[in-house]
Amino acid sequence: MVLDTTYHNKEYKQLIEDIVGEPFGFFEALRRGGIGSKRLIVNNFSPNLNFITNSVSDINYANIELRKQGILVMINKGLKNFTWAIPFYQLVFYKSDMTSIHAQGKFIQFANSKTFKENKKFLYQIMNEKIKFDEKYSFPQL
């Protein structure tokens, strides 16, 4: 679900917490070594996310925030902010020439730039959290 979070909205805050859980506390964030990514360069959006693309030939940036039950992908378009809430059970990573995040019939492709390489440890942390989440709901082996 993509929301326009430019201005504070209590309904959006509650909706985001229902989808991906509450944010981690201060000490938990320190213990994890951070819960947010650095700025990532967006190469491409899916056709149903093209309304977020900058209209001028400018670089699109995104940040990722880890939550208890999912992630938030925050995208800046000019002076507007958009937040894409993705629960872990819908989250899929693809790695090829570029890395992309797929969920809810949408995707974002990130460029393999210097900023992406700085975020590799954080992306592995997200993947580990997703694996832990999936293990809670896996079927027992017979």
Predicted regions and their residues:
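Short, contiguous, helix-prone interaction/anchoring segments in small proteins
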Residues: 33-66
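Phosphoinositide-binding peripheral membrane targeting modules
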Residues: 55-94
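Acidic, Ser/Thr- and proline-rich intrinsically disordered linker/docking segments
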Residues: 1-45, 90-142
